[in-house]
Swiss-Prot record:
Co-factor note (free text): Binds 1 [4Fe-4S] cluster. The cluster is coordinated with 3 cysteines and an exchangeable S-adenosyl-L-methionine.
Family: Belongs to the radical SAM superfamily. CofG family.
Catalytic activity entry: 5-amino-5-(4-hydroxybenzyl)-6-(D-ribitylimino)-5,6-dihydrouracil + S-adenosyl-L-methionine = 7,8-didemethyl-8-hydroxy-5-deazariboflavin + 5'-deoxyadenosine + L-methionine + NH4(+) + H(+)
Role description: Catalyzes the radical-mediated synthesis of 7,8-didemethyl-8-hydroxy-5-deazariboflavin from 5-amino-5-(4-hydroxybenzyl)-6-(D-ribitylimino)-5,6-dihydrouracil.
Pfam families linked: Radical_SAM
Boundaries of every Radical SAM core domain copy: 17-247
Origin species: Methanothrix thermoacetophila (strain DSM 6194 / JCM 14653 / NBRC 101360 / PT)
Name of the gene this protein is made from: cofG
Protein name: 7,8-didemethyl-8-hydroxy-5-deazariboflavin synthase
EC number per UniProt: 4.3.1.32
Keywords: 4Fe-4S, Iron, Iron-sulfur, Lyase, Metal-binding, S-adenosyl-L-methionine
PROSITE patterns: RADICAL_SAM (PS51918)
Lineage: Archaea, Methanobacteriati, Methanobacteriota, Stenosarchaea group, Methanomicrobia
Length: 326
């Protein structure tokens, strides 16, 4: 699919971006938080846990579509609302094992996790993730104990101590100041300097949702996003990729400003966090040279920083550069 893009790109003007071909599997939409911009979370009487058979059907479609990543996402510490903690975590491990059997590398974003919980999941994941969102204490998070910055920083730090390749990022336009954005990026940079585990930082604009507190809010302007990506490129170590979601904003100006990754693009499932924002088709991104990667970045493929159970599949899927084998 990349060949058509490369034919469109011309000379030094071409922009280059990596991406991962994935399937997005929402494990559960039960969540202890009640963020003012979220339409993913469901109240306990409406929330559900995906069945193994449904997850397997999605993975089968992902196989057919040539995906290499299974993105597992769920609400924050749902067992504090309903259910058994160990039972859900063991089920998540079971889904990760199924993904590996089907040739898909798991990347799990399960919200706030303790070090013990990270240790349970890490062997079955090529990488993991948790958005920092902001170091500021914001009104929009006042009913969300899992969005306290110090709690999120602790999980990101614990992942670093365990050498888990990690994706994090900031959410832009949720009531934070420009200074807050810079401080958040500086904290991420410092965590990486300490542990070396941050593979990418997402700069994600708010997408206001009808029926939520964010409904009357305005997403950040493109000019502000371009400026922020440029600032992020100066603050973050060069080995950290800057990711921008291509279904939320035109990625081309942001790539020109210093972003270099488009994240997971799924030919199989919607973005369950922003389901009304469809993924672009790969060949719609004209003028961008797309390079397919795995959910674990080449640097960490070479370092061997990935879950022990993922090793054999990574060796099958990665080329000599650590990118997706074609």
């Amino acid at each position: 699919m990349c060949a058509g893009i490369q034919a469109e790109a011309r000379g030094a003007e071409a922009l280059r971006a990596t991406f991962s071909r994935n399937v997005f599997i929402p494990v559960t939409d039960l969540c202890r938080n009640a963020c003012g911009y979220c339409s993913f979370r469901r109240d306990p009487d409406r929330a559900r846990v995906i069945s193994r058979s449904e997850a397997q059907r999605l993975m089968e479609r992902a196989q057919s579509a040539g995906c290499s990543e299974a993105l597992f996402s769920m609400g924050d510490r749902p067992w504090e609302v309903r259910g058994d903690r160990l039972e859900l975590l063991e089920y998540l491990v079971e889904l990760c094992e199924l993904a590996l059997e089907m040739g898909l590398l798991p990347h799990t974003n399960a919200g706030i996790l303790t070090r013990e919980e990270l240790e349970l999941l890490a062997p079955y994941n090529a990488s993991m993730g948790l958005m920092l969102e902001s170091t500021a204490h914001l009104k929009i998070h006042e009913r969300s104990p899992g969005k306290r910055p110090e709690v999120r920083i602790r999980t990101i730090s614990d992942a670093g101590a365990l050498r888990i390749p990690f994706t994090t990022g900031i959410l832009v336009g949720i009531g934070e100041s420009s200074e807050d954005r810079i401080r958040s990026l500086e904290v991420i940079a410092e965590l990486h300097r300490r542990y070396g585990h941050i593979q990418e930082v997402i700069i994600q604009p708010l997408d206001p949702k009808p029926g939520t507190e964010s409904e009357g809010m305005h997403p950040p302007a493109m000019t502000d996003m371009v400026k922020l990506v440029s600032i992020a490129r100066r603050i973050l170590p060069l080995e950290i990729s800057i990711q921008v979601p291509p279904n939320l904003m035109d990625p081309v100006p942001l790539l020109r400003a210093g972003a270099d990754d488009l994240g997971g693009i799924s030919p199989v499932t919607p973005d369950w966090i922003n389901p009304e924002r469809r993924w672009p088709e790969i060949d719609e991104l004209r003028g961008v040279v797309l390079v397919e990667r795995l959910p674990v970045y080449p640097r960490y493929v070479k370092l061997g920083w990935y879950g022990s159970r993922t090793k054999d599949l990574i060796k099958r899927l990665a080329d000599e550069r650590g990118l997706r084998r074609t």
